[in-house]
């Protein structure tokens, strides 16, 4: 007897595959003015992501803002309860805030978006398309920026130095807007303290897909990234990724030692021949002052490297979470 074969399709064949999840980490620091507009744009982005079979996870990290940023974040959560809010106990800096946000990522792909609206949220859609196409790492490089001339100059110098000393091939316009596969998450979460997230992600490799965009003009508030913070950021980046300064010091020391040996030999021979005249006190004093200052500068450079080692091994947390609203 032949058994009856059911003509109805199997239950599994009609089941839809669940959407993938895209997580966006948004560090917030004195961004009360831009948050309503940012959320409005992200709502549009979320709808367009769903058309790509992607759900959106929003993770806002309030980095000790002294304005009404936290209140604005609560308004966003009221409208969209799935939004995650991480409130830090004080200001720890954008790197620490970003890495704290990474700890709450649950998506298949994750990225970083500035809260000041200078980076267009719609750029996330194009990056998502490249991730769907198979790229694990997608970055959006600034081709131009509508910032004050001093800010543009300092940024240009910064990225030139980074490309020369730290990471040859690093995009000249720099980038903060990026999308990464979840396979990269563990590397970033476990990176050492004060590590430049964008540069470290680039250093990891993964053959990034590079997109381009024009950075918007700031419409709300003012930049809190002061000259002092820019300098500290540069020092942390160089000392965290490159041994070039120490090697330059070593090469310079060898050159000075060789020249000193030659000059010392000349003095000894001149003295033995009776042709030695003590002159040039002003020149000698200037040289001593110059090399003393240079030695102190080199000690400072070594101190920066030693400080990074100390910061990496001590038990002080990179950031302290005060409250979470998940």
Task: Please name every model-derived segment.
Residues 88-90, 94-104, 121-195, 216-235:
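Acceptor/aglycone-binding surface of glycosyltransferases and processive sugar-polymer synthases
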Residues 9-147:
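Structured catalytic core of nucleotide-sugar glycosyltransferases
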Residues 2, 9-21, 199-326:
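Hydrophobic helical membrane-anchoring modules
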Residues 78, 103, 129, 133, ...:
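Solvent-exposed polar/charged
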Residues 84-86, 169, 209:
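Structural signal for short hydrophobic segments within the conserved structured cores
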């Amino acid at each position: 007897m032949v058994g009856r074969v059911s003509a109805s399709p199997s239950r599994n064949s009609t089941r839809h595959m669940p959407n993938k999840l895209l997580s966006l980490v948004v560090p917030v620091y004195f961004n009360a003015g831009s948050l309503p507009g940012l959320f409005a744009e992200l709502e549009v982005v979320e709808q367009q992501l769903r058309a790509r079979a992607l759900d959106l996870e929003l993770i806002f990290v309030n980095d000790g803002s002294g304005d009404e940023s936290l209140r604005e974040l609560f308004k966003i959560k009221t409208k969209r309860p799935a939004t995650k809010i991480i409130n830090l106990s004080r200001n720890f800096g954008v790197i620490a805030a970003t890495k704290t946000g990474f700890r709450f990522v649950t998506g298949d792909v994750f990225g970083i978006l500035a809260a000041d609206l200078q980076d267009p949220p719609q750029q996330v859609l194009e990056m998502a398309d490249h991730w769907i196409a198979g790229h694990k790492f997608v970055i959006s490089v600034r081709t131009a920026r509508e910032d004050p001339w001093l800010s543009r100059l300092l940024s240009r110098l910064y990225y030139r130095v980074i490309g020369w000393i730290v990471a040859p091939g690093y995009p000249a316009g720099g980038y903060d807007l990026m999308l990464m596969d979840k396979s990269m998450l563990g590397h970033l979460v476990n990176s050492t303290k004060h590590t430049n997230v964008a540069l470290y992600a680039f250093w990891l490799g993964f053959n990034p897909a590079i997109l381009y965009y024009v950075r918007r003009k700031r419409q709300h508030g003012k930049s809190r990234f002061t000259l002092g913070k820019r300098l500290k950021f540069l020092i942390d980046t160089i000392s965290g990724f490159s041994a070039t300064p120490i090697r330059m010091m070593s090469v310079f020391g060898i050159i000075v030692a060789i020249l000193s040996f030659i000059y010392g030999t000349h003095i000894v021979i001149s003295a033995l021949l009776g042709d030695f005249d003590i002159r040039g006190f002003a020149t000698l004093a200037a040289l001593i002052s110059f090399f003393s200052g240079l030695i102190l500068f080199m000690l400072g450079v070594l101190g920066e490297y030693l400080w990074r080692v100390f910061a990496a091994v001590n038990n002080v947390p990179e950031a302290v979470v005060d409250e979470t609203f998940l």
